[in-house]
C-alpha cells in the first residue's frame, strides 16, 4: 500500500498510497524544538504520539468532529484522508504558558476566563508569524468564512478535550491544531499529541509534553509514556 515518500516534516513522514484519496502518516522518534534548532531522538516517541492521536481522533469523531483519521496500519503508521492543508496553525490557550507570557504582561499559570484563540501563518521561512483575518485573506490562505469555521471548530474541540483530559488528571494549557479542505468541507488534520499540546499533571503542575525536551525539565520518555498510560492504557496491557 505504501508508495513514494511525499514529504518529511519535523516529526512525521507522509507517503502516497495506491488510493489517491488517502495518505500514510508515519510517526517518527525525532524530537525538535525552537523551529528545528534543537534536535533529539526518543525511543517509542512515534508510537506514543500515534496512539494518543488515534484515541483522541476517535473521541472527537464520536462527538461529531470530522477528522482525517481513517485507521492504523501499524503501531506508528496512520492511514489518513488526503486534504488540502490550510497554512494556518490554530492555537487555543486556556492557561497562560510559553510564548504568550513573554510577548504580553501575563503570568504563567493564569487561567483565562474564556479560551484565547490565535492564528499563526504556518511557515518556517517566516517564523510562523501571528495572523489576523485581513492578513490571512490578503495572503489567500483562507476566506473569512473559512476563518470563522476554523474558530468554531477549534473552540468546539477545546470544549471536548478539556473535560476528556481532566478526567485523566491532565490539564490542557494550550494546543495547536491544523485543518485541511476536503470535498468542500474543513476537517481536522495533523495530530493531537504530546508534540502539539501542553499537558500538565493536574496534581503537580509538571509538564508532560515537549516542553520537557525543550527546556530540559527531566526525562522526556517518562513524560510521553505517562500521558500515553492515561489516554491509551490499553496499549500497556
Swiss-Prot record:
Q: Which PROSITE patterns match?
A: SAICAR_SYNTHETASE_1, SAICAR_SYNTHETASE_2
**EC number from the UniProt entry:** 6.3.2.6
Q: NCBIfam families in the record, alphabetically?
A: purC (TIGR00081)
Keyword field: ATP-binding, Ligase, Nucleotide-binding, Purine biosynthesis
The biological processes this protein is annotated with in GO are:
'de novo' IMP biosynthetic process; cobalamin biosynthetic process
Checking InterPro entries in the record gives: SAICAR_synt/ADE2_N (IPR028923), SAICAR_synt_PurC (IPR033934), SAICAR_synth (IPR001636), SAICAR_synthetase (IPR050089), SAICAR_synthetase_CS (IPR018236)
Q: Which reaction does it catalyse?
A: 5-amino-1-(5-phospho-D-ribosyl)imidazole-4-carboxylate + L-aspartate + ATP = (2S)-2-[5-amino-1-(5-phospho-beta-D-ribosyl)imidazole-4-carboxamido]succinate + ADP + phosphate + 2 H(+)
Task: State the SUPFAM superfamilies in the record.
Answer: SAICAR synthase-like
Pathway named in the protein's UniProt entry: Purine metabolism; IMP biosynthesis via de novo pathway; 5-amino-1-(5-phospho-D-ribosyl)imidazole-4-carboxamide from 5-amino-1-(5-phospho-D-ribosyl)imidazole-4-carboxylate: step 1/2
Kindly list the GO molecular function terms attached to this UniProt entry. Answer: ATP binding; phosphoribosylaminoimidazolesuccinocarboxamide synthase activity
Instruction: Give the protein's recorded name.
Output: Phosphoribosylaminoimidazole-succinocarboxamide synthase
The source's superkingdom equals: Archaea
A Pfam match: SAICAR_synt
Q: Which organism is it from?
A: Methanosarcina acetivorans (strain ATCC 35395 / DSM 2834 / JCM 12185 / C2A)
Protein family according to the UniProt entry = Belongs to the SAICAR synthetase family.
